[in-house]
Amino acid sequence: IMEFHEYVNLFSGKSGSGKSTVMDAIQVVLYGSISATFLNKAADDAKNRRSVLSYLRGAQKDGSYNRDGQDFCSQIVLEIFDTGTKVSTCIGVAFEVGKNDTDIRKYTFFSHSGKIPEDEYLTEKGVPYTIAGLRKLVEKRVDSSDNRGRGDVNRLYPSKEAYLKTVYDVIFGYVEPGRMMTMEKSAIALRMTNGTGQFIRDYMFPKSKEDTVSTISDQLGAYREIKER
């Protein structure tokens, strides 16, 4: 479990330390998609073709896998705390992967009221919940004192659209999906192969008809003139 608190706004580390892995996991949950097109394009992406399945199997740079040749279950979960209402809600996705699967066939997005359970989605034997096991947890949370949010969040969703509607409307408080994705993408370092200047233009300033960089430069110049007077 990794903790990100209110004032954490920088996620950094050495190359290969796993920054992209964490950000990709967050993006899967926020976008409701397991498509490789949503994953972070890292500097070494030509050598390491990322996919959610390769992540789940624990792909290593030498081509080996931590979970090769075995059936397993796994979850990616975000625990969200509303500082206004003091309500915690969890959103995520659960997977069941077969040892011979060449793509992800069985998975479901879910949400539930309250914090991550004390067992951290593990059975008494230390095995991650199956989708059926997760369904039981969600059903229990319906009658729990934790269920005090704005709407019905204790659900396993039949579609990506149903999941995202609950996440953006009920849990996040009517966030516009397109803007959410644009801003979140702008917060993630993708490629810097064209130099720092082009990277800043592409990913730190939203595209518009106006020359945003020139406008900001003019404003900074005017500010310096005022300061020097």
Language-model regions, residue ranges each:
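Extended, Lys/Glu-rich alpha-helical coiled-coil stalks
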Residues: V127-R229
